């Protein structure tokens, strides 16, 4: 009940299908991350945060309506174990537990973009604004792998044959929330602009 109140006070509803048996402090950090980014991006709709069993390789997921964030219940047990698993293969940008919720909030925020720009468009604009260099999509993906994470450059083919990069915004948001740099800060500034903020 205390955790429900803690979340509600921050505008987050805990969606607990099953009792929470993890580390309450770790869950509070996830709640704080969701609440911080909800406020920063002026998200008015209520957001739900929940936990459930997932494949051990998955740390979280976001519902298709962009209103529910799920964290793998295993990632909410012991911070040291979670952070060791996050950094094990260097596949993800996050190396702290807070990076998980920040990544999932990136999916929520992606649904708020109003000007039709993709994460790839915003990243290319970021590189130009910071370094003065115009880059191709292919160069952008290489830079993402090199400077953000391998996962950030993951390409998903859509049913209509168009390839999309759905992980750029979540991964850069994760970086900006946990260990910001001049590129992540500029990316977030442009992302806010794309969301009409």
Cite the ranges covered by each PLM segment.
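Active-site-flanking segments in enzyme catalytic domains
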Residues: 1-197
